[in-house]
Amino acid sequence: MKTIAFQENIPVRETSFDVVVAGGGVAGIAAALTARRAGKRVLLIEKSTMLGGLATLGLINLFVPMCNGRGKQIIFGLAEEFLRFSVKYGWAIIPEEWRNGEPATPTNVRYIARFSPHIFAISILDFLADAGIEILFDTIVSAPVMDGKHCRGLILEGKSGREFVEGKIIIDVTGDADILRRAGVPTVTGGNFHTYCCKGITLESCQKAVESRNIADAIVGFRGGSANLYGGGHPEGMPLWNGTSTDQVSDFLIRNQQELFRKIKDQPKDSREIVTLPGMAQFRTTCRIDGDYTLKEEDHYRHFDDSIGAICDFERRDFLYEMPYRILTRSGYDNLITAGRCASGEGYAWDILRVIPPAIISGQAAGNAAVLAIDSGKGIDSIDVSALQRLQSSQNVMIHFDDALIPSDSETSGERGEDYGHI
């Protein structure tokens, strides 16, 4: 590839920050809010024009199960707070058994919530702005500025041109490990199937909403690619995308939007409308940190001394996991940390970590870790994890699951439940 030499003096933003959060998805929102509640000056940078990431802009508006499939809630903390907030101002679908908290009697019905993505986006923005978090929209992080393995800050690109922002702790929650990769942190790329969905309405769905008096009934899904989580339905011979290059992202979007058009073009044109296309590529796994530990599918029912939160399998009942702090860090990088989709998990464990509730809990942990690192003067890769666990626990996060929740009936443990579609 040809190269050119390019050099310029980049202005430095007058304000420096304790914590700079790159990425306004649910993990980034959780990290930013946690650090701000601890009194830190926080900058949240989002490349699009709304908060929420895949949960809002990406139209994957589902809190997957936060319980064990037998009526016991596992995931609490900011995940519970955000779930309740997501349904406060817009339409909501929560199973009746869970509308008032954990049910009094065991149930196989799982604790999920579907919500209005756009109303959640604007309501959470109002919430964060009132909390005093500084937010930059339509701004891309183009590069970290490194001093060895220490990140001095980030080069930003926006309507003001290029500028540099300083931060004591940098949290990469871009979803694609963009900062980590460019900082030289070891990373691992994923592969994504031919999957794409958008939201629309039809005459039939609108009639149903009128009859039910529930606007949620008006909303239907339209699909481009229809491959499932495991690749079922992925066209033979079609390549997978890792989503880490401009060409890959563009090819994914072009193929899927063309397929969507082919599917709807012959329908009566007055009978349906696409209300919104996803504002980002709906990749599941693109690039993540090669962390100090990598969570594996077979780690279910395993306890970790450095757990930052217990989580559950969103497809299989009973399967419980703990997220070790080491999935967010890489030793030697003293002020870089990640969370959410960029956390270190392989195979199906990566899928477990990337969905909304676990992403929020790991984001909450990253925010708390940033606070501890700043207050103690230690590197974020060497903080007192027991202090982090105490902070998480004080914020209603279950650190270790109770072994009493491990079923003795191995035949029913791990049963797959409802198919939650494109997640």
Language model segments and positions:
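N-terminal Rossmann-like FAD-binding beta1-loop-alpha1 element of flavoenzymes
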Residues: 19-42
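Ligand-binding pocket scaffold of soluble enzyme catalytic domains
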Residues: 13-17, 27-28, 162-163
